[in-house]
Amino acid sequence: MSFAEEVNREEWMEKIGKLRFQRAEMNRLIMDYLVTEGYKEAAEKFRIESGTQPTAPLDSLDDRIKIREAVQKGDLEQAVSMTNKLNPDILDSNQQLYFHLQQQRLIELIREKDIEAAVEFAQGQFSEQGQESGRYLEELEQTMALLAFDNPEESPFGDLLHTSQRQKVASELNAAILEAEHKKTQPKLANVLKLLLWAQDELEGKKVKFPKMAEIASGTFEESR
């Protein structure tokens, strides 16, 4: 295909429709994602439905699952405690992760409208970290800015109160636990998606007009421009 060629949506979708993927390979990608991210119940259900064997014993996920669930429920104190019991070096050797866990704990106090406790926690926790917290000053300022709004969810930094923020921190902690256990920290599916984004950037850089995937989660495409 020459770089000047324009591919319309119908032609592009027809080409995609002709691609053939083995069901077993797709199932392995899904199972790898569920195991790596610590979704034991979903992995067990998928094993039964698809016959795909997990990439690791599912019982080995229990500690990671409990820690992830604690973060996703907003119980950061419990998540930190369980992580330290599992392996104290995980947080001792990862200042960025520790900051994000404490930041999330602050966010949960703000979510609960416990302003006095939030200010007290921020003054105590982040002043103790001293120079280290200075590295993350912008993130801390954005979090503290939530206190200035009657409805912080509707503020410019309201995304910090979304459940996706908990998910982000849970995934960061999950990856750190995997790394400490000398296991791969990212599911293969994430690498496939990165490759997709890279390929789209390459095509755009070569001025090829094509229907770009605009929303990966839903698989929706833009019209060619």
UniProtKB/Swiss-Prot annotation:
Signal peptide as annotated in the record: none
What InterPro entries does the record point to? CRA_dom (IPR013144), CTLH/CRA (IPR024964), CTLH_C (IPR006595), LisH (IPR006594), Ubq-SigPath_Reg (IPR050618)
SMART domains in UniProt: CRA, CTLH, LisH
Residue ranges annotated for the LisH domain, each copy included: 22-54
- Protein localization: Cytoplasm; Nucleus
For whether the record's keyword set contains Membrane, the answer is no
- CTLH domain segment(s): 60-117
Q: Does the keyword rRNA-binding apply?
A: no
**What GO terms describe the biological role, i.e. biological process, of this protein?**
proteasome-mediated ubiquitin-dependent protein catabolic process; Wnt signaling pathway
Q: Which UniProt keywords apply?
A: Cytoplasm, Nucleus, Wnt signaling pathway
Q: Name one GO cellular component term.
A: nucleus
Entry function: Core component of the CTLH E3 ubiquitin-protein ligase complex that mediates ubiquitination and subsequent proteasomal degradation of target proteins. Acts as a positive regulator of Wnt signaling pathway by promoting beta-catenin (CTNNB1) nuclear accumulation.
Q: Name the family the entry cites.
A: Belongs to the GID8 family.
Q: Which PANTHER family match?
A: RAN BINDING PROTEIN 9-RELATED
Protein name (database record): Glucose-induced degradation protein 8 homolog
